[in-house]
Amino acid sequence: SHFVPSLIRKIHEAKKKNKNNIILWGNGKAKRELLYVDELAKACIYFMNKKTKHTMINIGSGVDSSIKEFAKLFLNIIAPNKVIKIKYDLSKPNGTPRKVLDISLAKKYGWKPNYDLRVQVLKTYQSYTKEIK
């Protein structure tokens, strides 16, 4: 989802430039699901080895949170010692109210995500900071 790189960039720039707020589109209530790319790769390998044929299987975390909740978490991870407030631009759209996959079939086949969002966000941020140097 595009909101992750955008959120990381906004928080990083606010931290770097000593800004006291970030601006997010909408009201922050839209819900999203995140899955780290390594988890998707592991799921692909898992299901290739299972030899599941002719079956569509949703791969995701199965857990959603609001954009506001993600923003607070990302702020805590990226700028833990800074006071950066979240402001909402209500003139911009909220987006789809909720995006979360039903992963019950994947679970039925024995797969479940290893979902540690804090670690995944930290890895993503570390990768981002290496790339922008």
Tell me the role of every PLM-derived stretch.
Residues 3:
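The catalytic Tyr-X3-Lys active-site helix of short-chain dehydrogenase/reductase
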